[in-house]
Amino acid sequence: MSKRDYYEVLGVGRDTSEREIKKAYKRLAMKFHPDRNPGDKEAEANFKEVKEAYEILTDSDKKAAYDQFGHAGVDPNRGGGGYGGSADFGDVFGDVFGDIFGGGRRGGQRQAARGSDLRYNLELSLEEAVRGLTKELRIPTLAACDSCDGSGAKKGSSPTTCGTCHGQGQVQMRQGFFAVQQACPTCHGRGKIIKDPCNKCHGEGRVEKSKTLSVKIPAGVDTGDRIRLSGEGEAGEYGAPPGDLYVQVSVREHAIFQRDGNNLYCEVPISFSKAALGGEIEVPTLDGKVNLKIPAETQTGRMFRMRGKGVKSVRSHAVGDLLCKVVMETPVNLNERQKELLREFEDTLTGQSKKHSPKAEGFFDGVKKFFQDLNS
């Protein structure tokens, strides 16, 4: 049976923040937890599915692989066995869900949250994508407050341990048969109290800021490629590690070339006389114009391959080709003399269709036979 989409399992969108993913997970895990649904196999299966989705979507590497390749990107067996993790009901809440059913990190203080990952959509021209370049990107983000060094407390003071939860960030409450832990209402789950908050960040430890990064874009990138910059995401809470920045590449349509992998395609118009008599034509490439030899009697639609004139692979040393499709252009805006010459030329072909236009002759012979058979 095929697996459901992880985002669908948690009921979130692909651009949902990690914080919202955690909220969705917490709500669904409470709903399907075996302690609340004893003997219910369907609830147990749903619980495992929810946990699996959460563990993938809150791991930046696994999430990136899943976003790009789907379930195959996070399947350790690549086609067999499915998800490699286990749904251990004893430790499932140790990460983010330690406040439910009395689980969680016993005896340890709440850990400050890692910074959120950021995404930057970068649009490139085909030439930029093929050759590579260095781009200056201006990124709006949350940065550690330089006034309090990310502590949230005014310089010269320090956060103090919360007296309500004793630094745990959680308090225990009884709900029927269950001992439920919830975020401490005094410190809002932080485990610390900032009595004298920093004037710049107002006790948050982070401030909104824009930073400029110089990002090297490798030659050969294409739409859908993603570049990861470790540690360039939002600053973590109160000194926790920062998130990562993902640069999502898209390539604009080109006026001449179409790209398919490492190959480039283009259409080149040629005159009737050039197609019939042959000769050389100029063909555009990303490196400049080159001459292409057209054999006599070339038919419209013929494809010519120019090896090594495509795109160098971003993952290897292979270079694609340029494939040129010649399209014969019917002359327009003819003067009387030109029309007369064409009529004379047409007269010279009378009765010689099989010799000069074998495809057309074969086609019309087939049409004639079709109507004869139809009327017989």
From Swiss-Prot:
CXXCXGXG motif repeats lie at residues 145-152, 162-169, 184-191, 198-205. InterPro entries: DnaJ (IPR012724), DnaJ_C (IPR002939), DnaJ_domain (IPR001623), DnaJ_domain_CS (IPR018253), HSP40/DnaJ_pept-bd (IPR008971), HSP_DnaJ_Cys-rich_dom (IPR001305), HSP_DnaJ_Cys-rich_dom_sf (IPR036410), J_dom_sf (IPR036869). GO terms for biological process: chaperone cofactor-dependent protein refolding; DNA replication; protein refolding; response to heat. Coiled coil: none annotated. PROSITE patterns: DNAJ_1, DNAJ_2, ZF_CR. GO terms for molecular function: ATP binding; heat shock protein binding; unfolded protein binding; zinc ion binding. Gene3D superfamilies: DnaJ domain, Heat shock protein DnaJ, cysteine-rich domain, Urease metallochaperone UreE, N-terminal domain. GO terms for cellular component: cytoplasm. Binds 2 Zn(2+) ions per monomer. Zn(2+) 1 binds at residues 145, 148, 198, 201. Residues 5-70 form the J domain. Belongs to the DnaJ family. Participates actively in the response to hyperosmotic and heat shock by preventing the aggregation of stress-denatured proteins and by disaggregating proteins, also in an autonomous, DnaK-independent fashion. Unfolded proteins bind initially to DnaJ; upon interaction with the DnaJ-bound protein, DnaK hydrolyzes its bound ATP, resulting in the formation of a stable complex. GrpE releases ADP from DnaK; ATP binding to DnaK triggers the release of the substrate protein, thus completing the reaction cycle. This is Chaperone protein DnaJ. The gene is dnaJ.
